[in-house]
Amino acid sequence: MNDRKRAVQARVYGRVQGVGYRIWTRSEAAGLGLVGWVRNERDGSVTAWLAGADAAVSAMIERLRQGPAGASVSRVEVEEIETWTAPGDFRIVA
């Protein structure tokens, strides 16, 4: 069994604010057993910080590319985080 842990910061662009993207992200991430946070950015994008099992993080990145109904994702930029301390749950922070 692969229990490798991974953390990433993903920036999601497109029509991702005002469509329930953060609430959807929190629900999807929690369902995959991930911890982290999601927030709106001033430029209209959304940033998500995700940590957990490697396979779950990869699955969540794919889900971010799809987004919830009403969203239209144009691109997702992913940055690997080498050193991290995870919060105990998944939160909407802004």
UniProtKB/Swiss-Prot annotation:
Its EC number is 3.6.1.7. It comes from the Bacteria. Keywords: Hydrolase. The keyword Cell inner membrane does not apply. Pfam families: Acylphosphatase (PF00708). The active site is at R22, N40. InterPro entries: Acylphosphatase, Acylphosphatase-like_dom, Acylphosphatase-like_dom_sf, Acylphosphatase_CS. The keyword Hydrolase applies. GO terms for molecular function: acylphosphatase activity. Residues 7-94 form the Acylphosphatase-like domain. Belongs to the acylphosphatase family. This is Acylphosphatase. It comes from Mesorhizobium japonicum (strain LMG 29417 / CECT 9101 / MAFF 303099). The lineage of its organism: Bacteria, Pseudomonadati, Pseudomonadota, Alphaproteobacteria, Hyphomicrobiales.
